[in-house]
Curated annotation (Swiss-Prot):
Record-level GO BP terms: anterior/posterior pattern specification; apoptotic process; BMP signaling pathway; branching involved in blood vessel morphogenesis; canonical Wnt signaling pathway; cardiac left ventricle morphogenesis; cardiac muscle cell apoptotic process; cartilage development
Residue span(s) of domain NTR: 172-295
Cited Pfam families: Fz, NTR
Domain remark text: The FZ domain is involved in binding with Wnt ligands.
Signal peptide (UniProt feature, chain positions): 1-24
Name the record gives this protein: Secreted frizzled-related protein 2
Length: 295
């Protein structure tokens, strides 16, 4: 299948005999955005959200009102985990049509995502966001976008959907479920610097890593070795390189977790995470192991 701006333009215009009237350049932000002329910019390599998208140039200001590439880069990174969740095959296409709308020489108008593209992505991805405590934002409400009989970025046809045989995403090492006996649990506890029962207050993403801010009042300390109370007062843990893998074990921001990890370069890095399920046999074993821990 041909790729690039030309093929994308053909896809967008396939059901149109003419371009029709412009629907306005900007959907969001201050009214004066609509008077600012957009211009084409190369999509930078460090715009990870849109890495591998099938066009090279984007418009600024974009459809979210970002006027500089710095603004785009700062805001786009927070959406990478949603793409990594693979809740819908067109999540990246939808988000990039807003953060980095395609810029075509043949067209002065900024092309918006179609209403149906938004609806399909929202239906599949809003529950994933909700599990982490984040509602679908107002700025992405689908009523803002044109119907499919207008000029817009469409939902992929079934020919373009990810095949069922697509390789499963890699699971983060710290999040892999393991069948451990008491000796295994003791060994894991002893080789780590800390073991905590936590609840999550906030999750943010910095570069390739997940920053986990803890609810301080719900924290239970089981083990500290080389980690001070002062370190824990920061109430910040890190899951390294987590944007390159998935962590289904930690997909509910309201659940308690047992986390173990090590102090690395002044940061508390998680090496093991388990959702705490009261009464489950595994956690009864872990509690027993912690009480008689002798490393």
């Amino acid at each position: 299948m041909p790729r690039g701006p030309a093929s994308l333009l053909l896809l967008v215009l396939a059901s149109h005999c003419c371009l029709g009237s412009a629907r306005g350049l900007f959907l969001f932000g201050q009214p004066d955005f609509s008077y600012k002329r957009s211009n084409c910019k190369p999509i930078p390599a460090n715009l990870q959200l849109c890495h591998g998208i099938e066009y090279q140039n984007m418009r600024l200001p974009n459809l979210l009102g970002h006027e500089t590439m710095k603004e785009v880069l700062e805001q786009a990174g927070a959406w990478i985990p949603l793409v990594m969740k693979q809740c819908h095959p067109d999540t990246k296409k939808f988000l990039c049509s807003l953060f980095a709308p395609v810029c075509l020489d043949d067209l002065d108008e900024t092309i918006q995502p179609c209403h149906s593209l938004c609806v399909q992505v929202k239906d599949r991805c809003a529950p994933v966001m909700s599990a982490f405590g984040f509602p679908w934002p107002d700025m992405l409400e689908c009523d803002r976008f044109p119907q499919d009989n207008d000029l817009c970025i469409p939902l992929a046809s079934s020919d373009h959907l990810l095949p069922a045989t697509e390789e499963a995403p890699k699971v983060c090492e710290a999040c892999k479920t393991k069948n451990e006996d008491d000796n295994d649990i003791m060994e894991t506890l002893c080789k780590n610097d800390f073991a905590l029962k936590i609840k999550v207050k906030e999750i943010t993403y910095i570069n390739r890593d997940t920053k986990i801010i803890l609810e301080t009042k719900s924290k239970t300390i089981y083990k500290l070795n080389g980690v001070s109370e002062r370190d824990l007062k920061k109430s910040v843990l890190w899951l390294k390189d987590s944007l390159q893998c998935t962590c289904e074990e930690m997909n509910d921001i309201n659940a308690p977790y047992l986390v173990m990890g090590q102090k690395q370069g002044g940061e508390l890095v998680i090496t093991s995470v388990k959702r705490w399920q009261k009464g489950q046999r595994e956690f009864k074993r872990i509690s027993r192991s912690i009480r008689k821990l002798q490393c």
